[in-house]
Amino acid sequence: ELDDEVVRTRDNALMLSLEVTGIDGVTSGAATVSALRAGFAHLLDTLDERFTFYLHRMMRPAETGIAPIHGASFAGDIDKAWSRELDRRNLQDSVLILTVVRRQVAPLAVPLFGKAAARVWGEDTARRLEELREVASILETGLGIKTRRMKISDGSLVGFYASLLTGELRDQPRSPYCLLAEDAAGASVQFGKGGVEIEEGAATPRFAAVLYVKSYATATWPGMLDALGAAQDTIITHCYTPIERGSIAERVKRRVAQMRSAEDIAATVEAQLFEAADKAESGALGFGVHQMTITVFA
């Protein structure tokens, strides 16, 4: 780890995770959700391939915060019965965790000498760390949402990393004798055909399967995935890397040329591609590489 909030990956990327609270697709108004979507999309459109965003939607046990009524009384009996019913229902809170990654796009030219190499390494890290914190600050203050930075010291960040294997989001302390990767990957996983078996690291042995979404609908809307019934046993993951606006037009021209040479392009498709390139250059449309997976636990 670089500090209490920022982690350096094996490929020298820097990442920081935020828990987003206060808004969801079920209880929030359509106008509020649409405004948040537009603001977030505008931020993504101003960035390029140096940044990647991961959004995880998962569940954790809800904390009711109800003070118990002690003693033998009618109110106490009702309170005990109500508490037992809440425990039976196993209430869950929906959690959104946004991870911002400042990637190392080009290989870093490091001198051979130790002091010079350390200086170049330190300057590059400081520059990318400043850019990462700047984007995180915009997310925290410019979108009108409540966020909480996940930290190693309180166990929230390590617990989040570990939950991606187990599906159980809970705080996990940092071990002073292990690498962060070892703390995050403490579960024992056996891979089988079409799924995995989690033998250790979770409260009970579990099975999991990862579904990769490769065909997209013609239109989407905020909250459309909230209809998944088994919410507490699923993790929905989005990964998005923006593409620089200046390269869109060149990519469109190259794609059209390839389709023309293969005689596999219609006039309407060609027109749509050039229209999209014009919108990208004018700032009305953004492009990026998106991946989506759904992990189901049982």
Language model regions located:
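Extended, folded cores of ATP/NTP-driven motor/assembly subunits in large transport
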Residues: 1-298
